[in-house]
Amino acid sequence: MKHGETDSYWGGIIKSMGLVFGDIGTSPIYTLTVIIALTKPTQDNILGIISLIVWTLIILVHLEYAVLAMSLSRKGEGGEIVLREILVRMIKPGRQMAFVTFLTYLGVALLMGDGVITPAISILSAVEGTLLIPGLGGLSQNTLILIAGTIALFLFVFQYKGTDKVARAFGPIMVLWFAALALSGAISVSSHPGILAAISPHHAISFLMHNGLPGFFVLSEVILCATGGEALYADMGHLGRKPVKRAWYFVFVALVINYLGQGAFIITHPDAKNILFGMLQYQAPLFYIPFLILTILATIIASQALISGVFSIVYQGINTRMLPLLKVDYTSNQLKSQIYIGSVNWLLLCLVILIMLVFRKSANLAAAYGFAVTGTMVITGIMMTMIFSRTTKKWKVPLALFVTLVDVVFLVSNCNKLPHGGYWSLILASVPLAVILIWTRGQRGLYLALRPLDLETYLLSYEQIYKKGRIAGTGLFFVKEWNIIPPYLVHCTIRSNIVYERNVLISIVRTDEPFGVESVLECGIGTGLDGFMIKAGYMEIFDIELLLKQNGIQEKVIFYGIEDIATTNPIWRVFSVIKKLTPNFVQFNKVPAAKLQGVITRVEM
């Protein structure tokens, strides 16, 4: 292997650790601490719990995401929306299509709700480690919340500057973090090697059989070790499948060694309350404060990765017309994935601080955490099974069914959390889900209410108006499709006689591929009437002005339609409010404001 190849090989692994594995990598801070608070720390119980953790990582993260999900992609991109795009080509319109679409909406909503709980529990659990510093054990919970809230505030405030430069440090910090986890775990295992027996799955099965219903509900806390596993698939488009997979093997080994080490520490120190921090303080008191600082940095990186992930999901949702248009800023010239959505950023900050104030302790937050994750995993499992059953990879169907069944078991165990704060997962997910459902239904309703003309009918009147006289220059008119003429265009050209020497109908079509841009100019649709189509991937960022210039279109004025919705229906009223609060099509695509003319059409719904 050449030197350059070695650099890219290790460089990809290091970057993946920083951008993809922050969430799952910080799970050891709180997972075992929460489980032990609910379970008696006998040797048999500890062996069973550690075995459950190890096999949860193997089945739900490695098998479901690293092996199965990552084999399904579109131009290297992954995630719930990509799974839907793959499935849409395989099924006919009807009930199945509606079912798949709803599953996608639900999966996206759950992931967005998860984006609130993850930063809150990660930062709060790291800050709680300060209580083990000599002299700081008396810090009040209010002080800890204030510190955690301040860290969250700084994290969100700096989002608009972009994380491009800072992201370079994320990888090395997370490499250091995983090395520290592996080292501390190995030291602890060496003092009690009997814990290695937990690798055998029979201890996990034995624990579930001997503990009955309480043992089954322990699964709702065990799932905390796998939170962030979905990032392997959702974020693989940023760095590629191979670097993410390679990094996962290192991360998996580090996590397993650390969980085994924590298990060994509990067996020898059954009274320990905060397991990871207690283990580190016992092993190396002098290095405890540096480790605590590293922990806080790791949780900030984990939160950052999740915030970027939410931005990415929202952007995909906008471009697939699942979500309303929002103001998007691009913070990096190198990385297409580096975007900033201000409205989402500030909403996340408010909700993260609210969650910290409501739950106060990371142990309480753990009661709400996990439901959204298992819900997302079940949805991924169902969609993967549907895809594999329709391809040549039918041998993967039993594996996909197996992981989906395991996902369902974890989801059922998490229902126990609903009365104890788990309902927050549903509340947080219900808001984006309601917006998605109202927006998609509203768009369909609006299209039917507008009653657009077909091109042939429009041309009969247009040709007559064009002969009478026209304005010098080029006029641009935004439409969804050339052959479907919206009412505002009829009002402009036919009723108001606003016809230019050259009239160009411009449409932007988002393809079901993640990236790629092509423009098509079709001259002579009518006399002095051309069509200009921009085809762009649903994650693609492009410059409209540049594309117009490249195709020789020197516009004098740009027209677009604005719908004024009149309705007594409460759902359509909400839809109308969303439309008014969010940017319109031309604002979203950053069309030059000086040349814009909005034409209002009153629509009754």
Curated annotation (Swiss-Prot):
Catalytic activity: K(+)(in) + H(+)(in) = K(+)(out) + H(+)(out)
Keywords of this entry: Cell inner membrane, Cell membrane, Ion transport, Membrane, Potassium, Potassium transport, Symport, Transmembrane, Transmembrane helix, Transport
Protein's UniProt keywords contain Plastid: no
HAMAP family (alphabetical): Kup
Principal localisation: membrane
TM ranges: 18-38, 46-66, 97-117, 138-158, 169-189, 204-224, 247-267, 287-307, 339-359, 368-388, 395-415, 418-438
Topology within the bilayer: Multi-pass membrane protein
One of the record's GO molecular function terms: symporter activity
Places the protein is found: Cell inner membrane
Gene name for this UniProt entry: kup
The protein's name in its UniProt record: Probable potassium transport system protein Kup
Matches recorded under InterPro entries: K+_transporter (IPR003855), K_trans_C (IPR053952), K_trans_N (IPR053951), Kup (IPR023051)
Organism (species): Pelobacter propionicus (strain DSM 2379 / NBRC 103807 / OttBd1)
Disulfide pattern: none
A Gene Ontology cellular-component term: plasma membrane
Claim: Transport is one of the keywords in the record: yes
Annotated family: Belongs to the HAK/KUP transporter (TC 2.A.72) family.
Pfam families membership: K_trans (PF02705), K_trans_C (PF22776)
Task of the protein: Transport of potassium into the cell. Likely operates as a K(+):H(+) symporter.
